[in-house]
Regions:
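N-terminal alpha/beta PP-like core and its mobile active-site loop of ThDP/TPP-dependent enzymes
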Residues: 2-151
């Protein structure tokens, strides 16, 4: 690798991308993504939470108590900012992800920007069974996150 190569995890690259998105609002350069609401667990704690911790001054993160309320708060923020700034909502895999479905549908129906980052299932079956990981037992490629395809 060359001297100018930057090595990042996928989560670090994603967070870096989010931190570098800007929009002009009234001739003032503002961050497009104002912050993150998150509940961290398996599927996002060891990657995304760690990456967000590194940029907490640039992209603040608030821990929510319920996934749906976090996503709805993100929608309210976008609406109050006239769709010019966006909040991010993240959760672990399973019921936490499905709790954000109603808010996702609401944002879609009202054309309000919201970025939802749902946790992912484990890449292998060694930790099986995982607490609250929803998946199809006959087809491990089908997960709770597939419910977001419609919205």
């Amino acid at each position: 690798m060359g001297k100018n190569t930057i090595r990042l995890t996928m989560a670090q690259a994603l967070v870096k991308y989010l931190c570098n998105q800007y929009i002009l609002i009234n001739d003032k350069k503002e961050q497009l993504y104002a912050g993150v609401f998150g509940i961290f667990g398996h599927g996002n704690v060891t990657c995304l939470a760690e990456a967000l911790e590194q940029v907490k001054d640039t992209l603040p993160t608030w821990r929510g108590q319920n996934e749906q309320s976090m996503a709805l708060a993100g929608i309210a923020y976008s609406k109050s900012k006239l769709r010019q700034q966006i909040m991010v909502a993240t959760s672990s895999i399973g019921p936490g992800a499905t709790n954000m479905l109603t808010a996702s549908a609401l944002a879609h129906a009202n054309r309000l920007p919201l970025l939802i980052i749902s946790g992912d299932v484990f890449a292998n079956r060694r930790p099986d069974p995982v607490l609250q990981q929803l998946e199809h037992f006959n087809n491990p490629t089908i997960t709770a996150n597939d419910a977001f395809k419609a919205v």
